[in-house]
């Protein structure tokens, strides 16, 4: 892996004096050897782990003799660079020294979804939308205030007003059905009551002559002068 910065990162081609002779990238954390040659710190340490000589002049090198070139690092830090998410669509350019600060807020920077169990990496600008629809997201109450507890899938299809209207329509339909059932029952009772009343009227019409003629027959069967009362006498009592 290269220890320096990629040349394609820079808006303008960097000066050749800013290049590392080991990785051929722009110097990153430059250090100078006693022989005055400058390299990326990471590159020269890797080199010296294999051999103890300068990559350019082959002179022997000791670690304690390396010096950080802070002035050169500041000059390189002022070079204009592209965002590392330029291919993803970010058009921002900034000094190399400010690149890290931009990455921390770049909307194109890939972020890991914070929901437990989700391994997707999405751009920072789309993270909020992803969290709302993530299948691993937590359940939340409806933000519109209906009180429903919804998961990510339910939230995507949830519509308080539509569901309330559907519930109201269902209730109205049940009410209409109940009223129709009651009306049918009342009509049936009305028909039954009418039938009973007609049968009772017919019965009264048939029995009316009998009820009227009964007193006349009793009067004809009773002799004149008799009160029609039988006198009871105790048995065995002598007649005086």
Swiss-Prot record:
SMART domains registered for this protein in UniProt: RING, Ubox
SUPFAM superfamilies in UniProt: RING/U-box (SSF57850), TRAF domain-like (SSF49599)
Pfam families: zf-C3HC4_2
Domain of life of the organism encoding this protein: Eukaryota
Gene Ontology MF annotations: ubiquitin-protein transferase activity; zinc ion binding
Keywords of this entry: Metal-binding, Zinc, Zinc-finger
Keyword Zinc-finger: yes
GO biological process assignments: protein ubiquitination
Keyword Zinc recorded: yes
Zinc finger residue ranges, RING-type: 20-58
Gene3D superfamilies to which the protein is assigned, alphabetical: Zinc/RING finger domain, C3HC4 (zinc finger)
Zinc-finger ranges (TRAF-type): 101-156
Alphabetical list of PANTHER family matching this protein: RECEPTOR-ASSOCIATED FACTOR, PUTATIVE-RELATED (PTHR10131:SF157), TNF RECEPTOR ASSOCIATED FACTOR (PTHR10131)
Name by which UniProt lists this protein: RING finger protein 151
Species assigned in the record: Bos taurus (Bovine)
């Amino acid at each position: 892996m290269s220890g320096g910065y990629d040349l394609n990162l820079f808006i303008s081609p960097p000066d050749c004096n800013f290049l590392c002779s080991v990785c051929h990238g722009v110097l990153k954390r430059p250090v100078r050897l006693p022989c005055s040659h400058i390299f990326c710190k990471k590159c020269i340490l890797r080199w010296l782990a294999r051999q103890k000589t300068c990559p350019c002049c082959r002179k022997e090198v000791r670690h304690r003799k390396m010096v950080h070139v802070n002035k050169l690092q500041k000059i390189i830090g002022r070079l204009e660079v592209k965002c590392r998410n330029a291919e993803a669509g970010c058009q921002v350019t900034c000094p190399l020294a400010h690149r890290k600060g931009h990455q921390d807020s770049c909307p194109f920077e890939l972020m890991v979804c914070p929901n437990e169990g989700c391994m997707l990496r999405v751009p920072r600008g789309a993270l909020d939308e992803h969290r709302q629809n993530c299948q691993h997201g937590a359940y939340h109450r409806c933000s519109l205030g209906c009180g429903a507890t919804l998961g990510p899938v339910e939230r995507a299809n949830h519509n308080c007003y539509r569901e309330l209207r559907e519930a109201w329509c269902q209730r109205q339909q049940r009410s209409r059905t109940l009223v129709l059932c009651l009306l049918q029952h009342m009509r049936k009772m009305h028909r039954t009551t009418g039938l009973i009343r007609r049968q009772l009227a017919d019965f009264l019409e048939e029995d009316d002559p009998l009820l009227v003629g009964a007193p006349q027959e009793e009067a004809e069967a009773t002799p004149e002068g008799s009160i029609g009362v039988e006198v009871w006498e105790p048995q065995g009592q002598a007649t005086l």
